Amino acid sequence: MSKYNVLIVGSGGREHALAWKVKQSQHVQNVFVAPGNAGTGMDATNVDLDPADHDAVIQFAKENNVGLVIVGPEAPLVAGLVDALTDAGLRAFGPSKAASELEGSKVFCKNLLRSADIPTADYRTFRSADDASRYIKDRFSEPTDPVNVVVKADGLAAGKGVVVCDTRSEALEAIDRIAARKEFGAAGKELIIEERLTGPEVSVLAITDGETIVTLPPAQDHKPANDGDTGPNTGGMGAYCPAPVLDEETLAKVESSILVPVVHAMKRSRRPFKGVLYAGLMLTPAGPKVLEFNVRFGDPECQPLLMRLKTDLVEVMQAVVDGKLEETGPLEFDPRPAICVVMASEGYPADYEKGHAITGIESADKMENVKVFHAGTQRVDGEVVNTGGRVLGVTAMGDSISAAKLQAYKAVREIRWQGAWCRKDISDKALVTADKA
């Protein structure tokens, strides 16, 4: 079979990890990333394309022998880039615009879960800040009453449109930010207030062609900004894979009671799902329940997952595009666990400083079983500088989770820029689980 070129759409740590893994495929000649970052520019070829400009993406793919387009982030998926590529006769990995509603609208997702009898938190939806505020005030009469609810913007908000509330005033403030002040723009045209679930969180990803499902090893993300899972939510400050908190028996239950029913429900609603299905779950005393669904690889979960993957990723993605996933064998993973520590810019997840030169990436990359995946970086005048909130995903493998953690943080200490910071406790939850086992 002749080799072909692959185009990856996006510019984050997930896209750098995808480019790094796709480059290893025996079927691939060149890897292009649009628009990419400083790291993808080292492992692949960056292309100055706006993912929102569908015609430009199509034109580039047609002119450059692109045999597969991989759409990384949620925004271009929700905007229908895969549909545009497919209509133009190109092969694209990722769900259609209609199927991407599973992430693009939390209201759509919750209603689908309810109709398919898939376990999730009880919820109410609201179209106005006044109605939502009235609901909170009616339920909780005193300003200091504990409320235990979660307020969510309906649309995409870069992982920050979810506010976990402990008091009535916090819930009212969240409603005001999302639905009145429109901090997340059109994402706040509707909002959800749902019961707060308790238990450990875990991410289970699966690859599906709409018929066959291949479940991947579970990973655990760290959304809150600060150690001990405190502080505001972020896009994710680190992850590890596998997650020992989810045993084989529970993983099989997640597949049969959550993943398979969702794929069937999407098919019934004439939105067949092809691509990566990401279930964000809470392991409650009553069993696993869905917090959210995403329609792409998680970022940063993608980094440790792909570091462990031994199977040719491009062959799996081609099988999904062709509707032949059942013909691929089981995926092979390195038995060693991997951990990704996100290094962020000062001020993130609020306003952050950028444009500072970063040193030490090369020496960190040379360390055994370490790969530094770039996110918010660019090369300016020969230097790598920070241009985003989440800047690097320092990823390491080890014979145990504690060994992987040690190696990842050893690599983190090599890297410097003004205001750089990270959480110091990524994977500690896994170490606690392992100690109890």
From Swiss-Prot:
HAMAP family: GARS
Record text on cofactor binding: Binds 1 Mg(2+) or Mn(2+) ion per subunit.
Positions of the ATP-grasp domain: 110-322
Gene name of the encoded protein: purD
Organism encoding this protein: Rhodopirellula baltica (strain DSM 10527 / NCIMB 13988 / SH1)
Family listed: Belongs to the GARS family.
Cofactor list: Mg(2+); Mn(2+)
Functional pathway: Purine metabolism; IMP biosynthesis via de novo pathway; N(1)-(5-phospho-D-ribosyl)glycinamide from 5-phospho-alpha-D-ribose 1-diphosphate: step 2/2
GO biological process, one term: purine nucleobase biosynthetic process
Name this protein carries in UniProt: Phosphoribosylamine--glycine ligase
UniProt EC number: 6.3.4.13
